[in-house]
């Protein structure tokens, strides 16, 4: 009991039962299938429920994993030039503070170098097209950008090639290690999606998650 201090162990077990992580038969307590998946994939309670709820709604696995975790370590390659043109202190991180507001103000775009403007418009047309009231701070841009990274990987591009493609098309740079780490996490999350979908008899979601996982693994 020293290990738990004053914490009521019985209450903890009850809570884990309510979460459907544990089941009790007499004096025997075991992990449920759902509980085993959560434990082996080191999922937080909130992530576990996000996956379960999305699976029950039969959301696409790509959408599920990109909602779970955004790739936000993206930088504007031409941040210094943009800052000079607009006479502002321009943050280099794409998804930071007012960066998107600064650039995608109509007046701002007209002051940019033609090449940079085309890159910014390409970014806007691919990632800033949602109708959310809070756009661009609704999370849709990050989610779509994260989807793009995974889709490029499914085209058999290595992290180095993905970084190059992002620079060429959007003027956005990223570190290969960050891209690799994100894809590695996506594989783990897709595995969890597949297994949780099987537990809840959502065969279509499970199959799609399995196929996507294999493509990302390469």
Give the residues covered by each predicted segment.
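Short helix-coil junctions and helix-kink-helix linkers
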Residues: 1-7
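C-terminal helical accessory/scaffold domains
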Residues: 10-217
């Amino acid at each position: 009991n020293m290990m738990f201090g004053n914490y009521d162990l019985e209450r903890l077990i009850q809570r884990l039962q309510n979460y459907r992580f544990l089941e009790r038969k007499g004096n025997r307590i075991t992990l449920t299938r759902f509980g085993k998946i959560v434990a082996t994939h080191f999922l937080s309670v909130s992530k576990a429920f996000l996956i379960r709820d999305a699976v029950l709604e039969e959301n696409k696995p790509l959408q599920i994993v990109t909602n779970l975790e955004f790739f936000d370590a993206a930088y504007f390659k031409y941040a210094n030039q943009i800052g000079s043109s607009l006479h502002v202190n321009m943050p280099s991180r794409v998804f930071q503070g007012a960066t998107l507001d600064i650039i995608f103000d109509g007046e701002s775009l007209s002051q940019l170098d033609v090449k940079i403007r085309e890159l910014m418009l390409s970014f806007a047309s691919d990632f800033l097209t949602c109708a959310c009231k809070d756009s661009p701070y609704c999370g849709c841009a990050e989610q779509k950008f994260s989807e793009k990274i995974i889709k490029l990987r499914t085209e058999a591009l290595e992290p180095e090639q993905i970084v190059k493609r992002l620079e060429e098309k959007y003027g956005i740079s990223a570190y290969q290690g960050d891209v690799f780490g994100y894809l590695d996490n996506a594989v783990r999350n897709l595995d969890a999606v597949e297994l949780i979908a099987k537990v809840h008899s959502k065969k279509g979601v499970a199959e799609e998650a399995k196929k996507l996982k294999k493509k990302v693994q390469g």
